[in-house]
Every structure is written in structure tokens, then in C-alpha cells.
Curated annotation (Swiss-Prot):
NCBIfam families the UniProt entry points to: PRK02733.1
Membrane protein topology class: Single-pass membrane protein
Subcellular location: Cellular thylakoid membrane
Function: May help in the organization of the PsaE and PsaF subunits.
Biological source species: Synechococcus sp. (strain WH7803)
Name listed for the protein in its UniProt record: Photosystem I reaction center subunit IX
């Protein structure tokens, strides 16, 4: 359990960084597909 408590924040931080980066890149190349009126 101790190993999970030390690993989980690192995995979460990497996951959120990757997700944010993918969304930013997608929004840069396809700005009209992300936001529909």
C-alpha cells in the first residue's frame, strides 16, 4: 500500500500532463471540432 501511495500522484501528474498536452495540440490543429455552437 505504501508503494501505491507514492506512485499514484506521479502517475496522475503524468496522465494529466499528457491529457492536457493532447487537448492543446488537438485544439491547435482542429479548433473547430472541439467547440460546437
Amino acid at each position: 500500500m505504501q508503494k501505491f501511495l507514492t506512485t499514484a500522484p506521479v502517475v496522475a501528474a503524468i496522465w494529466f500532463t499528457l491529457t492536457a498536452g493532447i487537448l492543446i495540440e488537438w485544439n491547435r490543429f482542429f479548433p473547430d471540432l472541439l467547440f460546437h455552437p
